[in-house]
């Protein structure tokens, strides 16, 4: 795909919309990193912070899904860039390019969990679901999170989930 990947993604998005009718009433956004077992860096493959603490070059990717979890758009960025500011630009760009008007729920782990991202999501009428390690919570919050009440048990075939 190389440098032309954005054109390919656009073609695939149009084809998806033609076959499945994308639902832009709500969307979901998340970022992730991919590492490469190569020695030399490239335009996107840059050495950067890795969850696995690897020293290999990584690439960051932002993915936007519609309300039915169908891919709407994606964007890759150099792995040596912080995801925190990139996330805000990616969401704006992907929503604008794909004419997404509905609310976007940002899904993020601790790497993207910062006040600026939370405030921007709220200011834009969007939502967020940011994780936080239970191990690092103050004792009072940890006790609250680990309570057994306040959950609804949902059965999906053989799987049991607490919401």
Per-region residue spans from a language model:
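Anion-binding and metal-coordination hotspots
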Residues: 1-163
